[in-house]
Regions:
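Adenosine-cofactor binding site in Rossmann-like domains, unifying the SAM/SAH pocket
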Residues: 24-47
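Active-site "gating" loop of Rossmann-like NAD(P)-dependent oxidoreductase/epimerase domains
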Residues: 62-74, 103-123
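NAD(P)-cofactor binding segment of oxidoreductase domains
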Residues: 70-99
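NAD(P)H-binding glycine-rich loop region in Rossmannoid oxidoreductase-like domains
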Residues: 41-79
Length: 240
């Protein structure tokens, strides 16, 4: 049986490198930034015409450091909003299923337990840039938006916030289940159980120390960025 083809943008990033190690029954292409320039519709179209993929997993874009989305507004817009819009245009034109990596930062981050249909109000420019990409993806019905909360393994920091709740999961968990999700459509929150960053980190690094997001990031910083992952959990339970 002929393997279906997937183009994965952002293969040189943290998650992309881990995803490349997963043994899958698909032919997956990880083009370089030069080969697949998402700011150039003609280049995207040319590469897609050559590969003829069944799926396009769009993970490429600008993420860290977070202040880059303030310091270089043009780059943030070009990559995360316009670049994503370009990918949508080409996928729609060629009838390719699109899977888009978004973020839990699309939610306000104050009340927590946000469902996929909850009101959106990003609390920083990174969240706005990813939500801008979502707007384009939502216009294309043959798509799946993943609002993801994940981090590197092992936990990189010596201190962790004891007053900030979220849904951290490691890249490896998503890498191992992503391929099982690609035929879904709509919007899906992806992450681990709701807990403080400190509680998550402590399970994997006993030496991590407590610190306060309120003290470090200010009184206005949202402290409950957690998502409701019931839909994701139900899907995962059916798979395994």
């Amino acid at each position: 049986m002929k393997k279906k083809k997937i183009i994965f943008s952002g293969g040189s990033g943290r998650f992309g490198k881990i995803f490349q190690e997963v043994n899958l029954n698909y032919k997956i292409y990880f083009p370089s930034k030069k080969l697949l320039d998402i700011t150039n519709v003609k280049k995207i179209n040319s590469y897609i015409k050559k590969i003829k993929p069944d799926y396009f997993i769009h993970c490429a874009g600008l993420s860290r450091p977070m202040n880059i989305h303030y310091k270089d507004l043009s780059k943030s817009i070009d990559l995360n909003i316009i670049g994503t819009s370009n990918v949508v245009k080409v996928c729609q034109k060629n009838k390719i299923k699109l899977i888009y990596f978004s973020t839990n930062y699309a939610y306000p981050g104050f009340k927590g337990n946000y469902k996929e249909e909850s009101a959106l109000l990003p609390f920083n420019n990174y969240g706005w840039s990813k939500l801008g990409g979502e707007c384009a993806v939502n216009m294309y019905k043959n798509s799946l938006i993943l609002r993801i909360c994940m981090t590197e393994k092992p936990f990189l920091h010596k201190k962790a916030f004891a007053d900030l709740k979220t849904n951290f999961m490691f890249h490896e968990e998503l890498a191992n289940i992503l391929i099982k999700l690609i035929n879904k459509k709509g919007i899906l929150n992806i992450g681990g159980k709701i807990q403080t960053v400190y509680d998550f980190a402590k399970k994997h690094n006993k030496d991590v120390k407590k610190t306060s997001a309120r003290k470090m990031l200010g009184k206005k910083y949202p402290l409950n960025q957690s998502m409701n992952i019931l839909k994701y959990t139900r899907i995962k339970n059916k798979i395994f």
